[in-house]
Amino acid sequence: TAAYTSNFTPPTAPLTAVTNTKFLLNPETSISDLSQKSEIACFGDAATSTTQVKFAGTKSIYLDGTGDYLQISNVEDSWISGYTGDFTVELWWYPTNVSNGTYQEILTAGVGFQLYMSPAAGLSLVLSSNNTSSYFLDFWQEHTMTINTWQHLAVVRNGNVYTLYVDGVSKATTTSSSTFSSGTDPVQLGVYGGTLYPAVGYFQDLRITKGLARYTANFTPPTAELEG
């Protein structure tokens, strides 16, 4: 599809390379959504960091597990709650502590979407169609996370197939026609409900892609910072 078919006003904001990208958190200059579709609120002392980065010359976000988290708002178009099409949710995480509380919530939206690490460092994912604990998808401890190491996590829906990938390798997959719902609950990075099960570590390149299953088989994780 051609983006320009006649004279036009040049872009006045940063470009998003892929139109299906609905959210991209890439904290080079600030903690903001590079797709410019959502707003991000920082809680505690969540901040950018160069202590641990996935790619040289970039920045990550550090959450220390004591009140730090990010909350994404105005996500009507960017989040995939109730969405029946393909989607991809992915990010890099560098966990630094395996015993911070009972669980560590990596990315959540109410009860309906929870990507988390168990006390035994097991990567888990639950999805609910009515934002309750009645889950149609329950991937429990499908992979043992490695502490102090960057790992690429991806949740993909391709048709009716849901797959959880770690570092480009499928760790769990199931077929379901159900669609998850997080109701009106906000999307949060590094916590559940604003106070529960905080995650500790560094985060980078959180991207939400709507209308496209970026990964449909095992793949090589991104080798450079995401730009779109």
Task: Give a label for each model feature.
Residues N74-E76, S128-S134, W140, S182-Q204:
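Extracellular glycan-interaction patches encoded by glycine-rich segments
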Residues T149-T163:
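Localized edge beta-strand/strand-to-loop motifs within extracellular or lumenal beta-rich domains
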Residues T1-E39, F43, T48-K59, N100-G101, ...:
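Extended recognition patches within non-cytosolic domains
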Residues A3-T5, T66-L127, I147, V161-Y162, ...:
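Extracellular glycan-recognition modules
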Residues E76-S78, W140-T144, S176-S177:
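Beta-strand-rich interaction surfaces with strong enrichment in secreted/lumenal proteins
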Residues S60-L70, L127-F136:
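Extracellular beta-rich ligand/substrate-recognition surface
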